[in-house]
């Protein structure tokens, strides 16, 4: 892998995925109770799903010809990983508004920016012919072909 010759879409997705991966181990929430303070990383609860989304987007950025944009199937997978991670981060942010908003830490905000970065990089730098419906159809076709191939003796 040569980072210099890597396609811009793949490069930005990979950078955002690595930033999100690192953010998962940084403090997300700082809890203070009777003078005792503790912090919690993102590797709890729904944060684990966000972690897998970052890994999935990073792996997809490495697959295939790295000098070209992602093909429809991989583009749709990267888009879905970014969208799912973004939705979970927004949900966690809304949930935190109930009381602990001031205690959110750098890891939470970095993970939110990284998930939005994956989503925006995948969508903004896509091929002009790529669409969400086309990506979903391509993914469905690939799954059907793999299923048919595994059923034949």
Which sequence ranges carry the predicted segments?
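Compact integral membrane and secretory-pathway proteins
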Residues: 1-153
């Amino acid at each position: 892998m040569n980072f210099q010759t890597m396609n811009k879409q793949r490069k930005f997705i990979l950078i955002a995925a690595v930033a999100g991966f690192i953010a998962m181990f940084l403090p997300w929430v700082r809890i203070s109770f009777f003078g005792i303070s503790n912090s919690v990383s993102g590797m709890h609860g729904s944060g684990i799903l966000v972690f897998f989304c970052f890994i999935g987007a990073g792996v997809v950025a490495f697959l295939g010809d790295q000098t070209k944009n992602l093909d429809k199937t991989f583009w749709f997978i990267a888009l879905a990983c970014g969208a799912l991670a973004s939705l979970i981060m927004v949900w966690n942010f809304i949930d935190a508004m109930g009381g602990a908003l001031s205690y959110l830490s750098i890891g939470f905000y970095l993970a939110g920016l990284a998930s939005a970065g994956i989503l925006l990089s995948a969508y903004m730098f896509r091929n002009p012919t790529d669409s969400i419906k086309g990506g979903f159809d391509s993914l469905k076709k690939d799954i059907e072909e793999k299923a048919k191939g595994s059923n034949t003796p």
